[in-house]
Amino acid sequence: MDLKIRNARATDAPFLAWLILTAGRAHVKRGIWEVILNLPENDCLSFLELLTVTGAPHLFHHSCYIVAEVEEGTVSGLGGYNPDTHGYPKLIEALPEVYGKMGRFPIREMAAGEPPRITASIPPSVPGAWVIDSVATIPAYRRRGIVDRLLDNILDIGRRKGYRQAQISIYMGNTPAQRAYEKHGFRLLDEWPDPYFQTEIGSPGMARLICDL
């Protein structure tokens, strides 16, 4: 299989929207974005597509992603970012642009300037860590080692930027994902359980993994 890994571009927005939504579902059926937005799947995808091409960068902006492509097209990807310059505060700043383009109002919590309740279980960034996020592969191309190559690539990017540690968060109970990341040197740091998260997502909460670079 002839595989090319490259930086994502604005034209990858439809694929990145699928990737972010799919990564947010992980091993559960209703993902975190569907809970946050409370919209049908197609509307969630439209929202995420616009989110990846906002004027200002943030953790879900296309500039934070690398993708893998084969002759048939783009098949996998993941994000890596500096939480100090591209973290959640920058995401919040970008949201009005997306809602404006969609012609929708923010959900009640965000309209009041508060984060969505479901985000209370998202672990904070480890100080000084390079953060990996939103990992997903098209089903037909899974179990071919593509994510391994992407992970090696994104960890190397963090290493070259001077980071000494990398972090990734997963849903508690997603054992296959945890084992896959452990093969790359990640280890469980802590867990962030939340009954509300369990009710809405179907997972007890989120787990934070870390590795040395």
Model-derived features with residue positions:
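Conserved GNAT-fold acetyl-CoA-binding loop/helix
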Residues: 25-52, 99-101
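C-terminal "cap" of GNAT-fold acetyltransferases
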Residues: 164-167, 171-178, 184, 194-213
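Conserved GNAT acetyl-CoA-binding A-motif
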Residues: 129-130, 158-169
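Conserved N-terminal entry element of GNAT/NAT acetyltransferase domains
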Residues: 1-14, 28-34, 212-213
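Conserved beta-strand in the GNAT
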Residues: 67, 73-82, 131, 136
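Conserved acyl-donor/pantetheine-binding loop and adjacent beta-alpha core of acyl/acetyltransferases
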Residues: 84-129
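Active-site rim helix/loop that mediates acceptor-substrate recognition in acyltransferases
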Residues: 38-65, 70, 118-122
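Conserved acetyl-CoA-binding loop-helix of GNAT-fold acetyltransferases
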Residues: 143-156, 179-183
